[in-house]
Design a protein with these regions (language model features):
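Methionine-biased hydrophobic packing positions in alpha-helices, especially
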Residues: 48, 52, 337-341, 361, ...
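Bateman (tandem CBS) regulatory domains
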Residues: 248, 330-345, 397-408
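A short, polar/charged loop-to-alpha-helix boundary motif
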Residues: 385-401, 447-452
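Short glycine-/small-residue motifs
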Residues: 379-380, 439-444
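PLP-dependent amino-acid enzyme catalytic core
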Residues: 1-335
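Residue-level signal for well-ordered, solvent-exposed loop/turn and beta-edge residues enriched
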Residues: 61, 376, 437-438
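The conserved cystathionine-beta-synthase
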Residues: 346-365, 371-373, 390, 410-429, ...
Length: 452
């Protein structure tokens, strides 16, 4: 049983590790997620935010009544907001305009003053979120600018807490640690600690296209041609933060914006983990290099933050489609029935005369009907089978149960259109979707329309 805490800051850390099951079924070894959204600010950044503040207090750089100023993707700002509230400081955050509206709204809700700055400018441009924070720090008396990128308390926080937790939770069996890299604090702090326990542990960093990390790690060259705008939030950089200890990192893998977004949604559907954008990128990067793993390995992937910060982005179908991330092939059963989910399913019983089924088909302009018996699916009929029966038995005395075929397959709302199309291609005229207490039907024509 947990104790009673004196304040919210005391709940930071000691986050759970959760085995990934369905989404990692093709891996040769177990994969465990260190889920950092269980921190009070819903991200891993709570750890280092508190560490930076407490260090500044100890050094006398942050004095009572002072102002904390930080450039952030949102999560560090939230951690600093918690510290500012408990300790009595004012907080000003600068964010780039690519960050989600939810992040900005959350910071303001926590009492922070927020400056939104353009993304597509150089780091030293006066309007960049780095430069604006620097300017405010110079202009505002008694202010403290942690600058998480170069503040080594960032990685020290993970060396002191996150790393030991992972080692203890896996009982020292961890062989690979995988995490998205932004400021570099998490991978460097955790990596240093784990390699001190076992030098053979591999540390893999996940990068994004438009970032400099991977090429710099491989060539030791800072290539500005690697820098271009990207959508992924929380990982990748156009600078080399001092917190990134490239000697600790064994390998970098890059992930596209699209693949990271799709993996984020997949983790929610398959594992019940409602995660942030970079978490999907971290898992996708691991999945891309799973062939490097063996059955004897134990992998830990760290998931940075919570999905509530991305409701209007990766979890919004319109946002995904506008960026080409959610093609027709990524639709699921729910998308196909949305237009007619309010309509009742047309059915017949197996004891009805075939003429009743023919009348319903004509009335509703349909070509197939599920057959029910006491509320249970027992079969199906379609216009082809009906025509054959009418030709062979003109008296129309045939009952539905005498000519019905097998019941249509039943899927859930999250079944992909690709899987449904395969069922229809394999000979089924339609598929039923479980919807609340009843069902809805997806026909061959519905699929053709969705894919066209």
């Amino acid at each position: 049983m947990r104790p009673i805490y004196d304040n919210i800051l005391q709940t930071i850390g000691d986050t759970p590790m959760i085995k990934l099951n369905k989404i990692a079924k093709d891996f040769p070894c177990p994969v465990y997620a260190k889920v950092e959204y269980f921190n009070p600010g819903h991200s891993v950044k709570d750890r280092m935010a508190l560490k930076m503040v407490e260090d500044a207090e100890a050094r006398g750089e942050l004095k009572p009544g002072g102002t904390i100023i930080e450039c952030t993707s949102g999560n560090t700002g939230m951690g600093l907001a918690l510290a500012a509230i408990v300790k009595g400081y004012k907080l000003i955050c600068t964010l780039s305009d690519k960050q989600s509206k939810e992040k900005i709204d959350i910071l303001r809700a926590m009492g922070a003053e927020v400056y939104v700055c353009p993304t597509n400018v150089a780091p030293d441009h006066p309007e960049s979120y780095y430069s604006v924070a620097t300017r405010l720090n110079k202009e505002i008396p008694n202010s403290f600018y942690p600058f998480q990128y170069d503040n080594l308390n960032n990685r020290l926080a993970h060396y002191e807490s996150t790393g030991p937790e992972i080692w203890e939770q896996t009982k020292g069996k961890v062989t690979h640690f995988v995490v998205g890299v932004g400021t570099g604090g998490t991978i460097s702090g955790v990596g240093k600690y784990l390699k001190e326990q076992n030098p053979g542990i591999k540390i893999w960093g996940i990068d994004t296209y438009g970032s400099v990390f991977k090429k710099y790690h491989e060539t030791k060259q800072f290539d500005e041609k690697e820098i271009y705008s990207y959508i992924t939030e929380g990982i990748g950089e156009d600078i080399l933060p001092k917190n990134v200890d490239f000697d600790v990192i064994d390998f970098f893998e890059k992930v596209t914006d699209k693949d990271g977004a799709l993996a984020t949604r997949e983790l929610a559907r398959k594992e019940g983990l409602f995660l942030g954008y970079s978490c999907g990128s971290a898992f996708q990067g691991l999945r891309q290099i799973k062939d490097k793993l063996t059955k004897d390995d134990v992998v830990v992937v760290l998931f940075h933050d919570h999905g509530s910060r991305y409701i209007g982005k990766v979890y919004n179908d319109d946002w995904m489609r506008d960026r080409g991330f959610l093609s027709q092939g990524n639709k699921v059963a729910k998308d196909l029935i949305d237009g007619h989910s309010h309509l009742p399913l047309i059915t017949v019983t197996d004891t009805e005369p075939l003429s009743n089924a023919a009348r319903l088909m004509k009335l509703h302009d349909i070509t197939q009907i599920p057959v029910m018996q006491n509320g249970i699916l027992v079969g199906s009929i379609d216009d082809h089978g009906m025509l054959s029966s009418m030709v062979d038995n003109p008296s129309n005395s045939t009952l539905v149960g005498e000519i019905m075929g097998a019941p249509y397959p039943v899927v859930d709302l999250t079944t992909s259109i690709d899987d449904i199309a395969k069922m229809v291609k394999d000979g089924h005229r339609a598929v039923l979707v479980k919807f609340g207490e009843g069902h809805h039907i997806i026909t061959k024509q519905d699929i053709i329309t969705a894919l066209s």
